[in-house]
């Protein structure tokens, strides 16, 4: 019996030891789990927030372009950082939105999953503006960090300084985007864009007290033959299909734009020295879209039409020339005079506002029926206009 009790006690001791060992392993595993969780939480709290930075080698190749853009993008300008990554600088004014996109090839993002889209104002008190930072050749490093939904941290390093600022975010700011659908596409090479800018320069520099903002530029696109005309009160410029002006999709269209807005949009496209694509979006307010792209930068300008309020001097000049022609040719053959007046009507009627304030709609129907090359020119019956130009390259 003593032997049986000894075996029972030994078995009970083994069971208690096994249970104690099992509980010890559970406690040890629980402690390890909590320690790992605490270490992970501390690591997450102490690790760097997601950071967006420039590849400095690529940035140096576009520094001069960014310096030019800094002069063009000043007022009403916002900067948006996206996790693609990309940086979108957008400026808005009346009837014109300009957009500069710095592509992913020029940027580095440490954590695409945790970096959220953020928008700030271009104006940063400590640095004057964001555009001034990225166009400054003395900058050696620049970081944009996301560690709060309310602000963006900007860190800038130059040769002898290191500065950071917390910039408040702008909420509710929309980025204008191209829908990609257009019935019109015309590509102008860089030299053609430069020619149009030179042609616009005298118009936009004209000083008229209180009327400088009302200077208009009309863009006329015609199908047969494919041509694009730039028309102002002072002169006109015309291009036909060539290796410098390529018509991909053509539709009879007319745009009434601010001359200054058109000049600024073309100036944006001219900075990166590539071809400029003219497209349109068929909407309530018809937009003309100008786009230029390089490997690292994309420029877009969205222009909406201006309302023609009154008859322009260029239109009045055409009417006066009609009157002079009638008086100077009153002894000519009647059929020849009627033919000349009909031709003049074809040329100038699209610029004369209709009674309801909109432009006449009969130009393109008549233009398509006419195969005469003369109908593409302004044929003044008095002295010819020396400022009229026709470009066929």
From Swiss-Prot:
SUPFAM superfamilies: DNA clamp (SSF55979). Residues 311-333 have a biased composition (Basic and acidic residues). Residues 31-41 have a biased composition (Basic residues). One of its GO terms (molecular function) is DNA polymerase processivity factor activity. Signal peptide: none annotated. Residues 25-50, 311-339, 355-393 are annotated as: Disordered. GO terms for biological process: DNA replication; viral genome replication. Keywords: DNA replication, DNA-binding, Phosphoprotein. Transmembrane segments: none annotated. Accessory subunit of the DNA polymerase that acts to increase the processivity of polymerization. Belongs to the herpesviridae polymerase accessory protein family. This is DNA polymerase processivity factor. It comes from Human herpesvirus 6A (strain Uganda-1102).
């Amino acid at each position: 019996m003593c032997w049986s009790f000894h075996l029972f006690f030994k078995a009970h001791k083994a069971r208690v030891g096994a249970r104690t060992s099992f509980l010890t392993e559970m406690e040890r595993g629980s402690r390890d789990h909590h320690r790992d969780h605490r270490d992970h939480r501390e690591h997450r709290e102490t690790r760097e927030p997601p950071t967006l930075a420039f590849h400095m080698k690529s940035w140096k190749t576009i520094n001069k372009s960014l310096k030019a853009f800094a002069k063009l993008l000043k007022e009403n300008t916002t900067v948006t950082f996206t996790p693609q990554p990309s940086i979108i600088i957008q400026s808005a004014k009346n009837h014109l939105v300009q957009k500069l996109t710095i592509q992913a090839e020029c940027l580095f993002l440490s954590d695409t999953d945790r970096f959220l889209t953020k928008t700030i104002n271009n104006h940063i008190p400590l640095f004057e503006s964001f555009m001034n930072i990225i166009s400054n050749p003395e900058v050696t490093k620049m970081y944009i960090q996301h560690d709060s939904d309310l602000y963006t941290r900007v860190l800038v390093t130059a040769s002898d300084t290191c500065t950071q600022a917390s910039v408040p975010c702008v909420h509710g700011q929309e980025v204008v985007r191209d829908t990609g659908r257009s019935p019109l596409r015309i590509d102008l090479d860089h030299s053609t864009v430069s020619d149009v800018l030179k042609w616009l320069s005298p118009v936009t520099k004209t000083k008229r007290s209180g009327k400088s903002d009302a200077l208009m530029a009309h863009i006329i696109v015609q199908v047969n033959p494919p041509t694009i005309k730039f028309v102002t009160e002072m002169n006109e410029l015309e291009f036909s299909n060539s290796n410098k002006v390529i018509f991909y999709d053509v539709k009879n269209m007319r745009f009434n734009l601010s001359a200054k807005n058109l000049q600024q949009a073309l100036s944006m496209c001219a900075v990166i020295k590539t071809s400029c694509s003219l497209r349109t979006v068929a909407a309530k307010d018809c937009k003309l879209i100008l786009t230029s792209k390089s490997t690292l930068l994309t420029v877009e300008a969205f222009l909406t039409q201006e309302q023609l309020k009154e008859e322009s001097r260029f239109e009045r000049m055409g009417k006066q020339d009609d009157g002079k022609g009638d008086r100077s040719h009153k002894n000519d053959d009647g059929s020849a005079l009627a033919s000349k007046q009909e031709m003049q009507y074809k040329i100038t009627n699209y610029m004369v506002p209709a009674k309801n304030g909109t432009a006449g709609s009969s130009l393109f129907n008549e233009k398509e029926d006419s195969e005469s090359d003369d109908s593409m020119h302004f044929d003044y019956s008095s002295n010819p206009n020396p400022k009229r130009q026709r470009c066929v390259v």
